[in-house]
């Protein structure tokens, strides 16, 4: 797939986030045998990264799946395997079914806080 300037800008933003919020901490997290998912996911949600292809009315960006692919590709810059896997579970396993099949009530209660 050929990325547009918008795809590339998203990747630059994700890589900058990785360089400042993830990679400097990976070794310490692994040494302490922790993964501060709640803290990290809140930062990622605030940056819009957890709702790239989720509906805007629930806090997502409402973009098509090609932007999610660009995001996942950028996660390859993380200096470990577990963190991108956890992010992928959140963005591509846990929330898609809720976004697609959940009632409006469930989306408001569970989807919105999990992507924002």
Predicted regions and their residues:
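Short amphipathic alpha-helical coiled-coil/interface segments
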Residues: 14-15
């Amino acid at each position: 797939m050929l990325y547009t300037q918008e795809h590339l800008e998203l990747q630059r933003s994700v890589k900058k986030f990785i360089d400042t919020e993830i990679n400097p901490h990976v070794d310490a997290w692994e040494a302490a045998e922790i993964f501060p998912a709640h803290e990290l996911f809140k930062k990622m949600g605030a940056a819009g990264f957890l709702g790239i292809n989720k509906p805007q009315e629930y806090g997502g960006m409402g973009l098509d799946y090609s932007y999610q692919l660009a995001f996942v590709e950028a996660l390859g810059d993380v200096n470990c395997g577990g963190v991108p896997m956890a992010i992928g579970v959140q963005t591509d396993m846990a929330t898609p079914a809720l976004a697609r099949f959940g009632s409006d009530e469930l989306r408001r209660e569970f989807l919105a806080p999990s992507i924002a």
